[in-house]
Every structure is written in C-alpha cells, then in structure tokens.
C-alpha cells in the first residue's frame, strides 16, 4: 500500500510512475474524492467545535436559572448533523482506502522502464549449457522411465496439474529441499521457520494477495467458529512476512532473515493452456522461501544478497542460469524492484524462471503496520520487506533431471545432493 499522504500530495507524479508499469490511476476521480474528503473533514471538525461550545453553555445557563431546553435541542440537532457527516466521511474514507489497496507499488527508479517480459534486462549468466550428443528427453519422459513421476495417478486422485512422485525421484525431490535449507541456514544466516499452510484474510491483505488476486487462491469454506474462511498459502512469503504484522521490532534485531520449506497452492487462474505438460506449472508445489526484514536504507543491498543466496543453490548444483532485472511492466503487484533467476532447461532449449527475488520496500509493511524502532528516533518507522524463492523445488528437480541425463536415460546425481541421497551417484 502506498503512503496515503504521498498519494494525495503527489498525485500527478504518482500517476506518471504507475503508468510505467501499465497501471492507469484515475487522477480525476481521486482528486474529486480528496476535495470531498477535505470538505467533510472541515465540516465535521466545525460541527464538533460548535457542539462542544454550546454544550458548555448548558451548565452556565443552569447556574443562572435559565431554560436550557432550547440549548439542549440545539445540541441534539448539531449531534444529528455531526453523526450524518461522520458517517459520510467514514464511507468516503473506506472508498479511498479501497482504491489505495488496489494500487500497485511504485517502481524503484533503478528498475528499467518497459511494457512486458520482452523489456527485461539480462544482467549476468553463470555456467554454459551442456552440449548433448544425443536427443535429450524432457523431465516427463525421464521421470516416467524411472517410474518416478506419475501424472496419471495424480489426475485420478485429484485432477490435472498435480503430481505423484515415487522412488529415487521422490528422494531427490526431498534431497533438494534439505540441501537448500541447510545451505541457507548454515551459510547464509537464515532461521528455519515452520509456518501454517492456511492463513486468514488479514495475512493475505498484508502481503498484497488480497483484495486484487483472490481468484489465484484456494479458499476453504467460511469457518463458523473463526468467523471467516482460510486460504491455502500461494507462497511461504505470506506467513513468514506476516510474523512482523502489528509489531515493533527493535533496531538491534534487524536484519531478520527467515526461510521455510512449504507446499504452495495456486489456482493458476489465467494460465489455461500454458505449460500443461510436466511440473513447470502445478496447483501444488514445494518451495523453499527466503524472507528478509530490514531497515529502509539497507533494502537494496539486501535484495542483491538475497538474489545471490538463491543463485548459490544453482551454482552448487552446477546448473546454468541467467539473472534478469524485471522492467516496470513485468513486476509483481507489490514489488519495487525484482530480479528473476532463470535456469537452463535443455528439453525446452531455453531459460525458465526458477526464482523471483523482490524488494517490496514499505509497501507490505504499511499494510501490516510492521515497524521498527531506531535508538535515535522518537517514533517507530516502517520496515522494508524482501522475499524470494530459494528455490522452487519442483522446477529445480526438472532442471537436474534434464541437465544431468545420460544417453541411456539414467540421471547422474549432482555431487551436492549425494550426501542427502545416501551416497547415490546415479538414478537408473
């Protein structure tokens, strides 16, 4: 959520910056609503002052033995008018808040301006794609060859875009998760955190999934006892970041770095027909998430380090990748700046996204009222929040299967994973 004061005082400048990400802010409507808000605010304050002044005169009139009925009637009339104006102002503020909640974050000035993914800027590559002297198989064929990826059973049990994993493929999936968690906790300084897979509406509002992206979520039925329904998490970013909601953190505790391995659930609304084969786009998938809570002046440096932490996973696994900075038109709703890491998939002969690392600056913190207290400051200030995949486990499995395949369809186990697979060097 943008700073409401900034939105009011810098409306034209805000609209211009939002336009670079393809969002058209209705300046005329907001201007009219703001003028109306000011008018109602003044009227409400004047009515309150008048009522208070007249109310004080009641005691004076009583002391003089005067008839106070006319004064009390006047106070009643003012009270009724005040209630009406307050109700009108409340409704208007709710309308302004609803608009503010639908406005995306302002892109950072360092983000390249562009319309879509074609305008993203590659900033580095690591590793060279392997040249195979045989026809490569994709991960679906490899997984089925080793009886490790069972899409048919998943369709029978649940439906499309789900998977049943078995045997050494399932073991490799688990090994990847353990390897990622160990790397981030022992070398990168993150605290492993276990979080709920179901979250409430306040949490989804806090991180920006609601109100705009409700259709992308899986919702439970309304809970009678709780008074509201819960939703399955689309990413561990939601529960991890919301740990800071409605809290004031001491400056000495920052930065806070958390990691969690969870299943994630997405309806993939709007993705009909895209990546229908294999593990690339699933309704349920595992991910190791990285979240950082930092002081504002540290957030851009934190974005660089968080991105490097995700890249290190691919480097240790020996998987070629490239890193791109997203242009303004391709960034997520709450992001001020984003780096995407794309891993090389031989069967597709291209790089595919495996991690998205974003600096949300104070966008989420304002929604959540997540603050910190500096020793030199009189008042708490908003935190900056960052998140990224470290990594998406299923897509990493895809990359390992395809990049480490041999001519006979066997899979060489990357050295980094062998300690997690009982020393196994090859599948098949």
UniProtKB/Swiss-Prot annotation:
Q: What is known of its domains?
A: Consists of two distinct domains, a catalytic core and a N-terminal extension that is involved in tRNA binding.
Specify the domain of life of the species encoding this protein.
Answer: Bacteria
Which family does the similarity line name?
Answer: Belongs to the class-II aminoacyl-tRNA synthetase family. Type-1 seryl-tRNA synthetase subfamily.
User: What organism does the record attribute this protein to?
Assistant: Shewanella loihica (strain ATCC BAA-1088 / PV-4)
Name the chain's protein. Answer: Serine--tRNA ligase
- Which compartments is it annotated to reside in? Cytoplasm
Name the Pfam families on file: Seryl_tRNA_N (PF02403), tRNA-synt_2b (PF00587)
Sorted alphabetically, which InterPro entries does this protein's record hold?
A: aa-tRNA-synt_IIb, aa-tRNA-synth_II, aa-tRNA-synth_II/BPL/LPL, Ser-tRNA-ligase_type_1, Ser-tRNA-synth_1_N, SerRS_1_N_sf, SerRS_core, tRNA-bd_arm
Can you tell me which residues bind L-serine? Answer: 235-237, 289, 389
Q: What does this protein do?
A: Catalyzes the attachment of serine to tRNA(Ser). Is also able to aminoacylate tRNA(Sec) with serine, to form the misacylated tRNA L-seryl-tRNA(Sec), which will be further converted into selenocysteinyl-tRNA(Sec).
Its subunit composition reads: Homodimer. The tRNA molecule binds across the dimer.
Q: HAMAP family under this entry?
A: Ser_tRNA_synth_type1 (MF_00176)
Q: EC number(s) for this protein?
A: 6.1.1.11
UniProt keyword annotation of Cytoplasm present: yes
Q: Mind telling me which CDD domains this protein's record contains? A: SerRS_core
Q: Which UniProt keywords apply?
A: Aminoacyl-tRNA synthetase, ATP-binding, Cytoplasm, Ligase, Nucleotide-binding, Protein biosynthesis
Q: What is its main location?
A: cytoplasm
Is Ribosomal protein a UniProt keyword of this protein?
Answer: no
According to its UniProt record, in which pathway does this protein act? Aminoacyl-tRNA biosynthesis; selenocysteinyl-tRNA(Sec) biosynthesis; L-seryl-tRNA(Sec) from L-serine and tRNA(Sec): step 1/1
What PANTHER family would the database entry show?
A: SERINE--TRNA LIGASE (PTHR43697:SF1), SERYL-TRNA SYNTHETASE (PTHR43697)
Q: Which residues bind ATP?
A: 266-268, 353-356
Q: Which GO terms describe its molecular function?
A: ATP binding; serine-tRNA ligase activity
GO biological process assignments = selenocysteine biosynthetic process; seryl-tRNA aminoacylation
Q: Name one GO cellular component term.
A: cytoplasm
